Regions:
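Carbohydrate-interacting regions of secretory-pathway proteins
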Residues: 1-238
Length: 238
């Protein structure tokens, strides 16, 4: 019997995938038009000091999924933060107070544009990109970049192993440039990969956890920044 290596990673191979973004419009997406637009084949989210957003989300309404492989490219210009939501819900009351400046700019919070659930984090910061974040829940950061974590919903979390040095892995994240991001969700297992490098793994064994429910995809815009996302593809299993 001969041992063989797996086929090499080909980020541009979309066999078995469906596209969530047509490259020209926000068809299927739902968000505050003050912050979201399409430009040069990419979804652009932008918040400025004169147009602050706090947390706001562009929600993909045309698909819900539980088990899938998601691929996309993401770039941030500026100091704010972002992430890609998955298995997420809308309409849930927001836990963190919204600043008066944001309310003055946007009006009362529209919970249809606020997402609760798992997030693949992406920041220009060397700390957060690649980690597993549970948005708008008490769990928050569950698996930091470089960690393999086992959890049971919001009751417990335990470090099971290390993928690598958090700072060293962060040096693989490109600032002001495109990054390839892959998210794999199978049952209670979540895998985040950036630029071909494993960044974080979470195993959530609580079947009732908000992490383990089917839900929506979406993009977060947080703080003052410019965010670009393109080439969004999903291979949905269920």
């Amino acid at each position: 019997m001969q041992f063989t290596e797996p086929d090499p990673l080909d980020f541009s191979n979309h066999d078995g995938y469906v596209s969530l973004f047509d490259g020209a419009s926000l068809k299927g997406w739902d968000g505050n038009p003050k912050f979201w637009r399409v430009e040069d084949g990419a979804i652009v989210g932008e918040a400025t000091p004169k147009n602050p957003c706090g947390n706001t989300y562009l929600v993909y309404r045309d698909m819900k999924a539980k088990d899938f492989t998601l691929k996309f490219e993401m770039k941030i210009v500026g100091s704010g933060g972002s992430g890609f939501q998955y298995r997420s819900q809308t309409g849930i009351p927001w836990l963190v107070p919204i600043s008066p400046a944001v309310i003055s700019n946007t009006g009362p919070v529209n919970l249809d544009w606020m997402m609760t659930g798992p997030q693949a984090d992406f920041w220009p910061s060397q700390i957060y990109s690649g980690q597993f974040y549970s948005e708008n829940t008490p769990m928050r950061i569950i698996a930091w970049r470089g960690q393999v974590v086992e959890s049971f919903g919001d009751d417990s979390k335990r470090l099971m192993g290390a993928i690598g040095d958090r700072k060293g892995l962060g040096e693989l994240v490109k600032n002001d440039d495109w990054n390839q991001y892959t998210v794999i969700a199978r049952g209670g297992t979540f895998i985040h990969i950036m630029n071909g490098q494993l960044m974080a793994v979470l195993v959530d064994d609580d079947p009732n956890s908000s992490n383990n429910q089917p839900g929506l995809f979406g993009i977060e815009l947080e703080s003052i920044t410019q965010l670009y996302v393109r080439n969004i593809w999903v291979k949905k299993l269920n």
